[in-house]
Amino acid sequence: MPLYLTESEVEQLLTPADALVAVEQCFERLAQGEVDNRPRYRQRADGGALAVMSAVDRGLRLAGSKTYAAVPGGTTFVVCLFELDGGELTAVIEADKLGQLRTGAASGIAARHLAREGATSLGIVGCGWQAESQVLSIREAVPTIDRVVAYCRTEERLERFCRRLKAEAGETHRDPAEQDVVVTATTSRDPVLRGEWLNPGALVCAMGANRLSARELDNAVLERASFVCCDSIEQAKGESGDLVEPIDQGVLDWLEVHELQEVVAGEVQGRQSSDDIVLFKSNGLAAWDVAIGALAVERARERGVGREL
């Protein structure tokens, strides 16, 4: 019978370290051709959108989809998993926490493979729900990081975030931008990170903007980057203003953009020197939701957590 997992149960079952393992293994299967990922599709819905994204993971013998309604009244996420061998529905998972964990894990994996050796500082622009898992996952993936500098425009939110994550509060966007690893996790439509602020050797993980009309990075970030990668070129072409606009303007070419799975699998070398500026642009893959959802279900069945439908 299918298993139903709530948000609180997912939080009980999985840690950022668990998510790092599940998502990195997913990248390896993507590189091996064992996973087919379908980009997000959005359908307008009364001032918001219904979004659907899906993947088939032959390594896990699972297919799955994440569906969510993002409307003015709120956003609700759900992941459904199906067995490939028999077609049975195996799980329905409330997926807000799941999504937070897998998004943070992607940045952690990028930092593990692309941050310069001995990186000690992390800067984060944005102090919302997703930003928390960015900090936890990158700290887990890069143990040498011992300093976090955060900034957002809302002072109360910034103070609360810094207390919870033991971070320093920056005074402007520039303060986090000057760290070894720089994460943007905002809902801004206009750039919050300028290339001129970056120090040599920085890794930028741009996790926020996932629409063609929104950008977190200015063109100078792309101009200074020695290596640019994303989670899916196909998906980036449909929803990454941070890549599409600079490419349309001649700053970059799609032939120069790689996928993180190539780095994880050792097919390409991302960082060539300690002074290289490297960019990872993420929009999020359904394949990660399937992978981490599968781990949650495995743990739940082992521990007797969840409700059978």
PLM regions: where:
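Short helix-loop-beta connector
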Residues: 114-121, 144, 199-200
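Rossmann-fold NAD(P)-binding glycine/threonine-rich loop
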Residues: 200, 207-269
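Glycine-rich Rossmann-fold phosphate-binding loop(s) that bind the pyrophosphate
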Residues: 127-128
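N-terminal ligand-binding/catalytic initiation module
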Residues: 1-100, 108, 115-118, 287-290, ...
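Short acidic low-complexity segments
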Residues: 166-180, 193-196
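Rossmann-fold NAD(P) dinucleotide-binding segment
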Residues: 181, 188-203, 215-219
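NAD(P)-binding Rossmann-fold cofactor-contacting core
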Residues: 140-165
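C-terminal helix-to-coil terminal segments
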Residues: 275-309
